[in-house]
């Protein structure tokens, strides 16, 4: 079963160029999966279970602009072992402007450990066997050894944290945007982006470092990044930019 939400972009969604920011784009997708998971999430919360985002990969063809109406669609692709796979598409009218593939872990809050995904998950969510991006997230091996060619210190805010006292998944993309902007990169050129959530940022973390390095390629520049603090890595990832040729 596919679930969609539609809304117009407002001033809180856009950046200085009137285009949707990376963080806002992923918040819109997050709203769609929240709608899909409302009933199941309530049952899970009552038993101390939660979905935890482990990996995400996205293709961005165009960043929608202020007042543009967008539709975010999501579906459950399948689950296996400790993991569930969820897909997303973002449309502006008939134009698909972005898509994402995600891997989620099933977590027992009371026991503080992962659990196998319940066998009736597919029945609850409905299964749609379509990959929105064509990206195999299981084959991706994130790089952790980054040269810190560019760095930015990030200060967390109370509004960054969700009811579980962790930084919200979409806020990591706000942190990435800060890293890119402060070091002279144009996030509007990004065409693919992947992130692995290595460890949750707890509410006691007042600040962290974001670092990246870039590499040139014939088909456009690429970059790898990480977010960390005092030897603890919170997230790692990569992006590719459109070619200027």
Where are these regions (language model features)?
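Hot-dog-fold acyl-thioester-processing enzymes
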Residues: 1-53, 99-103, 107-191
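HotDog/MaoC-like acyl-thioester-processing domains
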Residues: 3-4, 55-141, 200-204, 214-245
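Small beta-barrel nucleic-acid-binding modules, principally OB-folds
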Residues: 48-63, 188-200
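Acidic/His-leaning functional-site neighborhoods
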Residues: 154-239
């Amino acid at each position: 079963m596919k679930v969609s939400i539609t809304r117009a972009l407002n001033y809180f969604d856009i950046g200085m160029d009137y285009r949707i920011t990376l963080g806002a784009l992923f918040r819109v997708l997050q709203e769609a999966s929240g709608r899909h998971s409302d009933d199941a999430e309530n049952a899970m919360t009552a038993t101390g279970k939660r979905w935890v985002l482990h990996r995400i990969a996205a293709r961005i063809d165009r960043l929608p602009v202020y007042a543009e109406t967008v539709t975010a669609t999501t579906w459950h692709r399948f689950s296996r072992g400790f993991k569930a796979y969820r897909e997303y598409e973002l449309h502006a009218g008939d134009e698909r402007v972005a898509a994402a593939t995600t891997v989620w872990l099933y977590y027992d809050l009371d026991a503080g450990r992962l659990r196998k995904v319940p066998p009736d998950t597919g029945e609850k969510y409905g299964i749609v066997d379509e990959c929105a991006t064509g990206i195999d997230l299981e084959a991706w091996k994130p790089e952790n050894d980054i040269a810190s060619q560019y760095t930015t210190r990030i200060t967390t805010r109370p509004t960054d944290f969700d009811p579980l006292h962790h930084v919200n998944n979409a806020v990591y993309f706000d942190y990435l945007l800060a890293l890119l902007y402060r070091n002279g990169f144009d996030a509007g050129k990004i065409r693919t982006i992947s992130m692995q959530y290595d460890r949750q940022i707890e509410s006691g973390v007042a600040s962290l470092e974001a670092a990246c390095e870039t590499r040139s390629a014939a088909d456009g520049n690429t970059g790898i990044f990480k977010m960390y603090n005092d030897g603890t890595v919170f997230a790692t990832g990569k992006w590719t930019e459109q070619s200027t040729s």
